[in-house]
Structures are given as C-alpha cells and as structure tokens.
Regions:
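Conserved inter-motif catalytic segment of the P-loop NTP-binding fold
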Residues: 1-67
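A short acidic, often aromatic-flanked loop/helix-cap motif at beta-alpha or helix-coil junctions
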Residues: 28-34, 122-125, 168
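General N-terminal targeting signals
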Residues: 10, 41, 118, 149-151, ...
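Short, intrinsically disordered low-complexity segments
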Residues: 22-25, 111, 134, 172-174
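Phosphate-binding/switch region of NTP-binding enzymes
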Residues: 49, 67-157
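Secondary-structure junction/capping motif
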Residues: 1, 30, 55, 98, ...
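Conserved alpha/beta core segments of nucleic-acid transaction machinery
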Residues: 34, 137-178
C-alpha cells in the first residue's frame, strides 16, 4: 500500500520515487519498547522525519493510558528529530474549535503542534477535498486552514491542487480560522 501510494504521488508531480530517501518500517512493538532499534535507523540513515501511523498503536496500551502516551512522547523526543504522529479524533465532537485526539489528554497536551485533517468525498468519486486545520501550536500563532483537491487517476497517479477551504460547505464548518 505504501509503495503504491508513493508511486501515485510521485507520478502526479511527474517525478521518480526517491527510494534512497524513504524508508518504511512495519512495527510490531510499542514505540518506546523499540526505541533503540528506531534510533539506530534514524542515525544510520540520517532520517529527519519519522511518521508514526498510528499514535494509538505506538503507545502500546489503551489510548486513555497516560503512562503509555507519556512513554511514546519521551521516546519520540529522545530521537532528536521531527516526529509526525497520526491520531484519530472522536467523530461526535460537537465543538469543532476544540477537536483533540481520542484517549488521554496527553496526546494533545504533549504535542508541540496539532493539525486536524478532514475531508469531503462523494461515494465512487475519483476526487475529494481535504482541509488541514491548525488546532494547537506551542510558541507560534494559529495558522489559517489549508485545503487541497485530491484527484486519483486509477492506480497511476494522485494529484493535489490548492483550493479554498471555505468554498466547500462541509469543510467550511470545520475551519479553525476563517
């Protein structure tokens, strides 16, 4: 899945996949338990961005368990590189300006910045619009929302086009700043 998606993205911009710059590691243990192995790869390959999908699995326990969440953040910070962790939010959240990851409040509180990704997609359509909303930033002002129209050409390519998030009625209701 990851390789196919990366090929689609690179085809969408007319470029080759930079294989020497991308690494994928399937994890079978909590992030904190595997930190020495992860650190070794980060150091050996000079990795400057680690993407953790998903944060709940990386914590190694219940998402409401503050010990597991704190362990994840301590391990992540020990790498001394940028970490992007992907977490889910509760679907029933009525207060759109206070959207936070489900589980322990530590997911939101310990993060340096939080961005929410929402999308509007019709069934069986090869395109959708996604909005990216800045919900939290330590030592920085909140940023305006961004939006992209994403278009799929079968398994061949994926293209992203900048668009106005306020122009989509569904996504307009999710915006952090107008």
């Amino acid at each position: 899945v990851h390789a196919r998606r990366m090929h689609g993205l690179m085809n969408g911009i007319g470029a080759d996949v930079p294989a020497q710059h991308l690494r994928y590691k399937r994890m079978h243990a909590p992030f904190a338990d595997a930190i020495e192995e992860i650190r070794s790869e980060v150091t050996e390959h000079k990795i400057n961005l680690v993407i953790c999908d998903s944060a709940s699995m990386a914590s190694g326990g219940l998402i409401s368990d503050e010990v597991g969440v704190a362990g994840f953040f301590l391990a992540a910070r020990s790498l001394d590189t940028t970490i992007l962790s992907i977490a889910h939010v509760a679907k029933s959240n009525e207060n759109r300006s206070m959207v936070k990851p489900i589980g322990s409040s530590y997911w939101f509180n310990q993060a340096r910045a939080c961005w929410e990704v929402t999308h509007d997609q019709d069934e069986n359509e090869p395109r959708y619009v996604l909005a990216i909303n800045h919900r939290k930033g330590n030592n920085q002002q909140r940023q305006r929302a961004m939006a992209f129209r994403v278009e799929f050409d079968g398994d061949h390519s994926i293209q992203y086009h900048v668009t106005n998030p306020a122009a989509n009625p569904t996504l307009n209701r999710t915006l952090s700043l107008p």
